[in-house]
Amino acid sequence: MVTVEEVRKAQRAEGPATILAIGTATPANCVDQSTYPDYYFRITNSDHMTDLKQKFQRMCDKSMITKRYMHLTEEILKENPSFCEYMAPSLDARQDIVVVEVPKLGKEAAQSAIKEWGQPKSKITHVIFCTTSGVDMPGADYQLTKLLGLRPSVKRLMMYQQGCFAGGTVLRVAKDLAENNKAARVLVVCSEITVVTFRGPNETHLDSLVGQALFGDGAAAIIVGSDPTPAEKPLFQLVSAAQTLAPDSCGAIDGHLREVGLTFHLLKDVPSIVSNNIEKCLSEAFNPLGISDWNSIFWIAHPGGPAILDQVEDKLGLKPEKLRATRHVLSEYGNMSSACVLFILDEMRKASSNDGLGTTGEGLEWGVLFGFGPGLTIETVVLHSVPA
């Protein structure tokens, strides 16, 4: 008779969860940040709000973003004038777009990751789909499974309405799935488009304007599995993962799905909340490894905005090059919510290879990935690089 312990042992992988491939995708429509204020106030029929437009121009100028990608073109916005008002009932029209476009953009990223992985898609055992856009049943996980032609027995997990910390969440969940299911190969997709959050300006809701200045569209996909085969090429090992709520941070970042779409609220002290709590998260994650020099590890931090990055850098005494990959992705794409940290992983491993550095993590062995978002929730993932 087989024991439960023997069954459990046979079910589990031996090695750590490992990222085996990364793919990204963006909509074709690219917007220039320097001219975006003129476009945004024109398309929302708000040019008469001259003072507010000047504030928005300053927000865009300080954002450190050069361009973003957006599904919403001028043509789509003209067809849906309710999107351009500040608080017009518009959820039905927004939903009609996102339930189609979120899985479609996710499919592009997934196909890129699967191509790099180089294995038949029939080997995918699990799917995790994460989006802050467009709740539906069956969900985007189902739509993606159909679009890619995955096996009907693939085990799916749909994560809606998580927000900007969720790039860390999906890695934490994928790690548990890969390590507890022998031969599991987990396809993780984060697909985010701003169709639900786009709205016209209002003088009483400046934090909404901050979102209009920062958010962009993008999808990222990774393949995660333990015990890589000789045909697979490991990129990063997922060593540990933790989630915590920052103390005294209730209401710091909120999103509410209403008839008018997804409304966004952000307190001014978010950068200080993050920077005041980040060292505790680092210490808890790296003390077991005997690491306390935060410049000795590579960094992947969700780029919520330049103020968060500046305060984290200052609080921890980080050298400017530590957040190079993070700032590069913010500059080239804006804040893509959950997808951002996966874009940064992709940027880091490519730059490390191009620069001839010894590992996928800028030549360093250990690294950290941070997600920050509603709650205020902080996700901390310890990464181990592999030889480049």
Swiss-Prot record:
Enzyme nomenclature, EC number: 2.3.1.74
This protein's record includes keyword Transferase: yes
Pathway per the UniProt entry: Secondary metabolite biosynthesis; flavonoid biosynthesis
Gene3D superfamilies, A to Z: 3.40.47.10
Keyword Acyltransferase: yes
One Gene Ontology term of the molecular function aspect: naringenin-chalcone synthase activity
GO biological process, one term: flavonoid biosynthetic process
SUPFAM superfamilies for the chain: Thiolase-like
Active site: 164
Catalytic activity: (E)-4-coumaroyl-CoA + 3 malonyl-CoA + 3 H(+) = 2',4,4',6'-tetrahydroxychalcone + 3 CO2 + 4 CoA
Key words of the record: Acyltransferase, Flavonoid biosynthesis, Transferase
Family: Belongs to the thiolase-like superfamily. Chalcone/stilbene synthases family.
Function: The primary product of this enzyme is 4,2',4',6'-tetrahydroxychalcone (also termed naringenin-chalcone or chalcone) which can under specific conditions spontaneously isomerize into naringenin.
Name used for this protein in its record: Chalcone synthase D
